[in-house]
Amino acid sequence: MVDVPCFVGIDVAKAQLDIAVRPSGERWAVPNDASGVVTLVERLQALHPILIVLEATGGLERSATAALATAGLPVVIVNPRQARDFARATGQLAKTDALDARALAHFADVIRPTPRPLPDAQTQELRALLGRRQQLIGMRTAEQNRLAGTSERLTQDIEAHIAWLNARIATLDDDLETTLRASPLWRENDDLLQSVPGIGPVCARTLLLELPELGTLTRQQIAALVGVAPLNCDSGTLRGRRTIWGGRAHVRTVLYMGTLVATRFNPQIKAFYQRLLVAGKIKKVALTACMHKLLTILNAMLKHRTSWQVQEVQN
């Protein structure tokens, strides 16, 4: 008997995993715990699926994804917005766990995203540290916003919490520094990125950990991945304004901050920025173009293993 090629969608929740198989229509659920993941792997190994698709769900998908990948099964984690837009485009407006699993299986069959190797244990640890740092930064910002208009007693409490958060952020920065510098490859890439005026430790490490494709893609591909590639909005004879959209939001935010610094202290980006302003571009558009240019430079540096000084002459 010849196995029928199949595609699997898995909807991930805190309590359980809902699984749908296409084209057979088979559906079942398992607990999202160690025993449930073992059952999931065993059943899917028997099916020999062409592709398994899950949504990114803030880390709830990690144990299942790791187990599936370790078992040699082709698994991909996709952006939830992309999956939901696909479901709407196919006419599925209702939303339940079972329906979402079925939509993900359909997505796997039609779109066929390419599986990528899972990051190694050290990369996952570094990403976890960076993610925790982002959480603490958000908490500190919220507390700083609460300072205005509060009583003296509350102000003292908030300031004490901010001081504690500052200490924890500093500790995480030290942990990131120690872990990253312990690896020769990470250390080399970190040094290459930080050699560029405007790219500091936080920006460099965010790019390395949240944009691992940096240095492996073309400049058009990396710009689209981050969300700084200008997108057309044309129809007939109408030529609409170019805009940026989508991509990895946190990477784009950090790159924006690095670009702001680069427009002041990086001679190449500063000159490019000034030329755009003289040409009549508004500052927001000019900064976006500088983000695109800076990202292109960083991508080329990692691809060709060249320092900033060499890259500056080449550009």
Task: Describe each model-derived feature in a short phrase.
Residues 120-124, 153-157, 189-191, 236-241, ...:
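Short linear capping/connector segments at secondary-structure termini
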Residues 201, 206-279, 283, 310-315:
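Phosphate-backbone recognition surface of nucleic-acid-processing proteins
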